[in-house]
Amino acid sequence: MTCVTPSPGCGSVEAYDGRRSVSSTLLSRRDLRFLLYEWLDAPRLTERPRYAEHSRETFDDVLDLAERVAAEHFAPHNRAADTSEPVVDGGRVRMIPQVKAALDVFAGTGLLGASMDESVGGMQLPHVVSAAAFGFLQAANVSTAAYPFLTLGNANLLLAHGSAAQVDTFVRPMVEGRFFGSMCLSEPQAGSSLADITTRAEPQDDGSHRLFGTKMWISGGDHELAENIVHLVLARIPGGPPGVKGLSLFIVPKVLLGPDGTLGARNDVVLVGLNHKMGYRGTTNTLLNFGEGVHRPDGRPGAVGYLVGEPHQGLAQMFHMMNEARIGVGAGATALGYTGYLKSLAYARQRPQGRPLADKDPTVPQVPIVAHPDVRRMLLAQKSYVEGALALVLYCGRLLDEEKTAPDPADRARAHLLLDMLTPITKSWPSQWCLAANDLAIQVHGGYGYTRDYDVEQHWRDNRLNPIHEGTHGIQALDLLGRKATMDGGAGLSLLLETISATVSRAWKADGEAAELAAQLGAAVDRIAGTTRRLWATGDPALALANASLYLEAVGHVVVAWMWLEQLLAVDAATGAAAGGAAAGGDADAAFYAGKRQAARYFFRFELPRTTARFDLLDGLDRTTLDMRDEWF
């Protein structure tokens, strides 16, 4: 079916081509095979004890399962979750039933614990494989997928910092999908300024605490999708240090548990209201009061909470979850950009309009709009953004596997440092440029893209959250330039630049087009090093950080150019010809590899040059924004 006029069903993914499966417009399995098996060599991880029970076949089975669940249970209600968002009814959240039905199916697959230890009910899959599998769910319905992914972050934090009893009590039910999780940081008066959090936690004789305060912007903070919600809450124990050093982390369940783990009384956590959002509408976003006295455990006000680890270590513990969440944000942004690209590509191949410039005969049939150069430009830009972003997300997944399982402790430390350095980039670059891909997907659809008859406008609205939550674009920029680039004497930045330079050296030796692109990338690496030195040589942090967002964007573009050069080298290895050649596997493989080459060319010719103007402004220590005054606006 070709949706050239609005009609019922044109908003569904099936509308793009009745002969294609829903999953064909979520993510590209061919691209995932290339990234996992031809570039990142994921099967080699099965040589390590943690992953010894797995094989490429089990990896493919997991991808098949995730793709099927996404297509059959998540995608069908994506539009309904957007148009019929959750509401508060009698103090309880009501939402469309398809959300819980889909999450029950997902819980039954065991995928929520895909990369967790078998001892807590997990599958012990490599993180790079689980990241690829989860991409299907995020592409199909990012708001429904948010509930288990928030839960996954909670569970991983407690595995890292919780006691054995806390793991048994709370993590196992989360892995089983019976309990879900939320992360409660922000407060109405504090926003992103965690130093200004005022929620207090009063110690009790039994070792627990009673929490009093208000939390804002809490995704998944209340719903009826699971038996219980495990809130992880930052709060202050009276008498602690001021600022972020005085924050402690607490487990605050929505429903208290008995000694045997059975559900008991309601905790003193109250839903005040829901925030109504531009996108991500199927995910509840809540204002919660802790200790209001509506529910009175043991006859007293105060939300019962259990300290995680030691007092005043809450921020460090929460950043364990935050770093994971930030990479997850980048993964979600990538998935939304990717599905938008595939849908606009399918539309462009089917939508007839216009004729070639050389043929003005009105009796000649119109051509599909994919034949027009400007449409190809928009599609190629999207391809370069989303496939570059997916490579970056999966590369980070591979680094996490190295950090956890590399035989050499030095390799583990190196992977940890490199992942730490890449985290703000992996969060921010896909959030900015896969959103730009969604914008182009709308443009490819023309006027129809601006209507709700097609999915692409919703993808843009959903994706617009990603530059904001889990640390805004500006906060990531300050983190990269103000902390990551200078920590340990610049060790993280040095490692990143050395790693990129190693790829440049390999490409030089490969000769041909790879060597040509390597020269460009090598020059860009030198700009990063020189610009960073110049900024901090001023001795003025305010001046050095005034244009931190430009630094983040420039370094991000260089990193994604690196991802494209890595992919080009993998294509060369697969085809056996640095200058391009036929590949085993027939015409489909040949077209795939040719598309990779062309996308790499596009990124180096159209995108990497963008960094020059940014580096020039940074090198010039431009004060335009710093010197601007409030009264001049």
Predicted feature descriptions by range:
Residues W217, L257-V272, K277, L287-A325, ...:
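A glycine-rich, basic-preceded beta-loop-alpha segment at the flavin cofactor/substrate interface
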Residues L152-N154, S163-Q166, F170, E470-T472, ...:
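A structural-propensity feature for long, helix-poor, extended segments
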Residues M487, T503-F633:
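C-terminal amphipathic alpha-helical interaction region
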Residues V13-A145, T169, D616-L617, R623-F633:
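Amphipathic, small/basic residue-rich leader segments at the start of a protein or domain
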Residues S115-P126, S143-A145, G330-G337, Q432-T451, ...:
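Conserved phosphate/anionic-ligand binding catalytic regions in large, soluble enzymes, centered on
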Residues S23-L26, P203, Y280, Y395, ...:
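Alpha-helix capping/hinge segments and adjacent helical runs
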Residues P86, Y147-T151, G162-Q204, G397-H416, ...:
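Internal maturation/activation junctions in enzymes
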Residues S208, F212-R266:
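A short core secondary-structure module
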